[in-house]
Structures are given as structure tokens and as C-alpha cells.
């Protein structure tokens, strides 16, 4: 053990425990990728029946959802809802962009205080620096592999005192260290990992609508009335 401790110290670590933790994290970094599970799915033999693919996708989705409901995620969900804001800014880039846009698409119908940052990436620094205040909240979607620009923009918001909610699929996400609230679906190595991210999104929107009632309800009623008045309930070409 003396030889091991000398090696650990030679590598720049204070203790064997610290060395093991760093080694484990490095191993996860090397082997954690959402693309690995996709490659495995695509490489299955052509003899596999379509119904088997359907069943396997459902089974993986169920496992992902079971892993989502942890005491930590439950408490962090509550903490996210408790954050009050003048404006809710949404950020998601690359593989996280669809989630950010979906949140805006649904929530803005009943909650008009949403500002989307994901469409004009060239000006995202400007909007954070000029428009946001500590009374706002930044909701960040950042799934692995994390986009550098997302991390830098989130760090800028953090330095400006903007509270941050992070929705991610792995605890390896660098923003875990600075986010005020972290909901980690732990689904990075699952082909159905986005299922959990969508469920978190739906839950956040549902609770947001409930807590902003009756304003949220009135906004939905206004939309329904406008659609009825203009004959748009049954869409025409």
C-alpha cells in the first residue's frame, strides 16, 4: 500500500480516495455518450422483428422513467417551481434545442413571460448581458455531450446573479456545479433517454400552469375563444 500511496502522490492526488474518484470520473467521461446506445440499436441484426424493436423501446423507456423518480429529483423539482421570476429565459443548443423550443411552444400559450434564447445563438450573449436581471430565471437544457457555448452562456448568467435551473441527463455536466437547481434524468446511456427529459418538461409546464392560475386558465380560454370565433378548431388547408 505504501507503493500505491507514493504513486498516488506522484500523480498529484492527496489521497487514494481522491484518486479513485478522479479515475472513475475519467472513465465515465470516456464511455458516456448518447451515441453509443444508438449505435448498439442500429447494429442489431436485420432478422430482428419490428415488434421486438417496439417492445425493447418501451422496456427501456420504462426503466428510464423508474430511474427518474429519485428523492433528489423530487426535491429539486419542488425547488425549481419555488423560484419566482419576472421573465423565464430558456436555453438549449444542438441536441437540447428541441426540448427548449417545445417548452416555449406549450408554455407561452398560458404563461406570456417566456423569453427564448435558443433561436439566435449569435446574439445570446447580448440578450443575457443586457436584458436579464437577478429577478429573472434561466432554464437550461443541456444533455450530453454538453455544448461549450451553452456552458459559457450559463456561466455568464451565473456571474450576473441569474438563478439557474438545469435539466440534464448526466451528473457529469459541468453546469451541475453552478446551477441553483439540477434535475438529472441519469439517462445518457439509454436509447430512450429523451423520454425522461420530456416528462420533466411536461411536469414543469403543468405545475407552472397550476401555480399561475387563474391567469393561466384565462389565457387558455382566450385562445380557445379566438379559435372558435375564427373557425380554426377544424384546420383548413
Model feature map: region roles:
Residues 12-14, 207-216:
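Short helix-capping/linker segments at secondary-structure and domain boundaries
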Residues 1-75:
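HTH-adjacent hinge/linker in prokaryotic transcriptional regulators
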Residues 22, 26, 80, 222-226:
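Short acidic/histidine-centered micro-motifs embedded in hydrophobic/aromatic stretches
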Residues 73-85:
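Glycine-rich phosphate/diphosphate-binding loops that line cofactor/substrate pockets in enzymes
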Residues 83-212:
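Glycine-rich phosphate-binding loops that contact phosphosugars or nucleotide phosphates
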Residues 215-237:
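A short, charged, Gly/Pro-tolerant segment at domain boundaries
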Amino acid at each position: 500500500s505504501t507503493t500505491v500511496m507514493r504513486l498516488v502522490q506522484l500523480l498529484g492526488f492527496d489521497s487514494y480516495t481522491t484518486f479513485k474518484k478522479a479515475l472513475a470520473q475519467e472513465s465515465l467521461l470516456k464511455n458516456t455518450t448518447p451515441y453509443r446506445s444508438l449505435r448498439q440499436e442500429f447494429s442489431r441484426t436485420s432478422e430482428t422483428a419490428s415488434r421486438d424493436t417496439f417492445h425493447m423501446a418501451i422496456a427501456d423507456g420504462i426503466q428510464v422513467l423508474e430511474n427518474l423518480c429519485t428523492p433528489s429529483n423530487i426535491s429539486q423539482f419542488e425547488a425549481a417551481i419555488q423560484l419566482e421570476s419576472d421573465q423565464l429565459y430558456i436555453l438549449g443548443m444542438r441536441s437540447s434545442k428541441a426540448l427548449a423550443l417545445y417548452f416555449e411552444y406549450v408554455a407561452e400559450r398560458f404563461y406570456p413571460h417566456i423569453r427564448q434564447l435558443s433561436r439566435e445563438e449569435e446574439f445570446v450573449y447580448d440578450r443575457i448581458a443586457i436584458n436579464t436581471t437577478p429577478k429573472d430565471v434561466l432554464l437550461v437544457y443541456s444533455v450530453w455531450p454538453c455544448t461549450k457555448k451553452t456552458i459559457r452562456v450559463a456561466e455568464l448568467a451565473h456571474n450576473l446573479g441569474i438563478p439557474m435551473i438545469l435539466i440534464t441527463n448526466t451528473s457529469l455536466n459541468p453546469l451541475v456545479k453552478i446551477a441553483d437547481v439540477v434535475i438529472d434524468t441519469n439517462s445518457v446511456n439509454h436509447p430512450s433517454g429523451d423520454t425522461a427529459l420530456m416528462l420533466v418538461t411536461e411536469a414543469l409546464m403543468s405545475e407552472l400552469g397550476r401555480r399561475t392560475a387563474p391567469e393561466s386558465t384565462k389565457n387558455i380560454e382566450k385562445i380557445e375563444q379566438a379559435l372558435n370565433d375564427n373557425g380554426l378548431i377544424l384546420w383548413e388547408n
